[in-house]
Each structure stands twice: as C-alpha cells, then as structure tokens.
C-alpha cells in the first residue's frame, strides 16, 4: 500500500494509528490449533537475548507494548511430516490472522508464544522448526488490507499467495487427501 502524495500519506498514517485499517494475513503454523478461532492478547517487547527478536513471553527489555492478534483456523494438516526426517510431528494449521495492533513481528511472536510458531520461521521457531517441502522462507503472507477512503467508500486490496507458498499448501492438501 503506497500513497501517491503527502495528503494520501497523512490520511493512511492517521488510519493506521487509529487502528481503522483491517489487515489480514495467512500463516501456516506448526502443530494443531484446537480452537476454531481465538485471540492472542500478549504484550510484546524486544528480546533480551536477541535484539532483532520481539517476544511476548520471557525475558524482554525496553518498552513493553500492547499487542493483540485475532485468528481463525482455515484448515488443519494433522500428522503430515514435511520430510521423513521430521516424521511424528503434529502437522500444521493454516490460519487467517488479524493483528489489531501493529507491532514488529507481532504475528510471528504471538504464535511462537502459544507454542505454534510460523512454519519455516528460523528466528521464532527454536526447537519446533518445521518447514513443508518446497519453501525456504517463513509461511506468512500479507493477504489483504481493508480501509475506508476519504470519500467514505470502503476498499479491500488483496494479494495472491506467492507460488512457492501456494505449492506448499497444494502438497499438504494432496497428502491430507491420501491420509483420509
């Protein structure tokens, strides 16, 4: 989302600060989230160990800021190992995440804090690092933003899933169909 002039930039900045822009992300997380939907309401601060990392639970330093993420489960891929070396894992859960606050690494930090790190996330997964075949980056996609225009109308801008992420989901779907 880019502004073409200063007036538009100021308008967008004000909407973001007032939390009036709805952001939607798709994330594939490690393990099974049992609830169909939920809210993660955990403050986030800079990690005392790793300055690039933001943590919701544990040793934090600096300013601790409010952070809220709502989510909805879209699909479950239970017990599907991404490779023979990772057999016995709990599988993955595809979620739609809606950050209500705009903290750096908020979604990654929040899902890691509840024991369901984003797939392929080397910074936040720790010992739970799992990655479905075919992708080499975290499975987190900015899917849409929705906002009110100065005219009062609403607009929703959507971004297609990148080919590597779409292929990884397709592979998980095929494996799921075989299991059923």
Language-model-detected regions and their locations in the chain:
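RNA pseudouridine synthases
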Residues: 2-180
């Amino acid at each position: 989302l880019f502004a073409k002039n200063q007036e538009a930039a100021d308008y967008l900045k004000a909407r973001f600060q007032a939390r009036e822009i709805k952001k939607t992300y798709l994330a594939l997380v490690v393990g099974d989230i049992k609830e169909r939907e939920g809210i993660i309401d955990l403050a986030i601060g800079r990690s005392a160990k790793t300055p690039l990392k933001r943590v919701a639970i544990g040793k934090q330093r600096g300013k601790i800021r409010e952070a809220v993420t709502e989510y909805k489960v879209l699909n479950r891929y239970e017990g599907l190992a991404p490779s023979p070396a990772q057999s016995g894992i709990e599988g993955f859960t595809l979620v739609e995440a809606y950050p209500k606050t705009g903290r750096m690494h908020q979604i990654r930090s929040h899902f890691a804090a509840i024991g369901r790190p984003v797939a392929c996330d080397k910074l936040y997964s720790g010992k739970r690092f799992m990655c479905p075949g075919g992708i080499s980056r975290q499975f987190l996609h900015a899917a849409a933003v929705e906002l009110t225009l100065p005219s009062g109308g609403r607009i929703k801008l959507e971004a297609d899933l990148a080919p590597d992420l779409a292929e990884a989901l397709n592979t998980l779907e095929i494996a799921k169909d075989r299991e059923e």
